[in-house]
């Protein structure tokens, strides 16, 4: 089971936030995450693994402040220790930065690059945020592998279409260039012929 929430800010469209029911489900989320996903977890404490799905073309720097705090509060609220504390640090990083090795416990992860891990602090629990998110909560039993494959297939098709469009434009540009070269060649030829005609005419006048 995966829990889905909706978050939005004043200046952006809605974002999807999701988290697994337990550490075993977290394994599937780690395995089948998307490049657009940002992972959240309470720093140095046990907590839920919360993911924010960015819009295509966005990166971690583009997360609206309101959406960032929604994710941080949701993580804090789903930490047995963290939910009782103030000034809780929450770490977040792109899904692609998560490192999972065979010797790690279920639900445990590391990072490929520590420099790509960011921290946001939740000073205290804000019920208004949690209540708002709770109203958007939806429980689903998704086929994460199938959804990931569908996403990847769409991306491959988009890239294929972009390559085809690029080739079409290149072909069109080559055609235009060839036509311009032919036109310049024809114009140059006509100019030479005109000059020859004028010279012939002048010679004829001189002999009259």
Swiss-Prot record:
This is Coiled-coil domain-containing protein 25. Residues 1-66 are extracellular. GO terms for biological process: positive regulation of cell motility. Residues 147-184 have a biased composition (Basic and acidic residues). Residues 147-208 are annotated as: Disordered. Residues 21-25 are annotated as: DNA-binding. The modification N6-acetyllysine is found at residue 23. Belongs to the CCDC25 family. The chain crosses the membrane at residues 67-83. GO terms for molecular function: DNA binding. It comes from Pongo abelii. GO terms for cellular component: endomembrane system; plasma membrane. It is found in: Cell membrane; Endomembrane system. Keywords: Acetylation, Cell membrane, Coiled coil, DNA-binding, Membrane, Phosphoprotein, Transmembrane, Transmembrane helix. Transmembrane receptor that senses neutrophil extracellular traps (NETs) and triggers the ILK-PARVB pathway to enhance cell motility. NETs are mainly composed of DNA fibers and are released by neutrophils to bind pathogens during inflammation. Formation of NETs is also associated with cancer metastasis, NET-DNA acting as a chemotactic factor to attract cancer cells. Specifically binds NETs on its extracellular region, in particular the 8-OHdG-enriched DNA present in NETs, and recruits ILK, initiating the ILK-PARVB cascade to induce cytoskeleton rearrangement and directional migration of cells. Residues 84-208 are cytoplasmic. Interacts (via cytoplasmic region) with ILK. It is a single-pass membrane protein. The modification Phosphoserine is found at residue 204.
């Amino acid at each position: 089971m995966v829990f889905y929430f909706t978050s939005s800010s004043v200046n952006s469209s809605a974002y999807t936030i999701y988290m697994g029911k337990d550490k075993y489900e977290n394994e599937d989320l780690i395995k089948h995450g998307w490049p657009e996903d940002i992972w959240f977890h309470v720093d140095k404490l046990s907590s839920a693994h919360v993911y924010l799905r960015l819009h295509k073309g966005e990166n971690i720097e583009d997360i609206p402040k309101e959406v960032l705090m929604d994710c941080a509060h949701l993580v804090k609220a789903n930490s047995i220790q963290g939910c009782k504390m103030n000034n809780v640090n929450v770490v977040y990083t792109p899904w692609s930065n998560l490192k999972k090795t065979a010797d790690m416990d279920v639900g445990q992860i590391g990072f490929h690059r520590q420099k790509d891990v960011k921290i946001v602090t939740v000073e205290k629990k804000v019920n208004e945020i949690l209540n708002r998110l709770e109203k958007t909560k939806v429980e689903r039993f998704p086929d994460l592998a199938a959804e990931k494959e569908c996403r990847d297939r769409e991306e491959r098709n988009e890239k294929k279409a972009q390559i085809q469009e690029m080739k079409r434009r290149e072909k069109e540009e080559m055609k235009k260039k060839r036509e311009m070269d032919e036109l310049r060649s024809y114009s140059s030829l006509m100019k030479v012929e005109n000059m020859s005609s004028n010279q012939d005419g002048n010679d004829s006048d001189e002999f009259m």
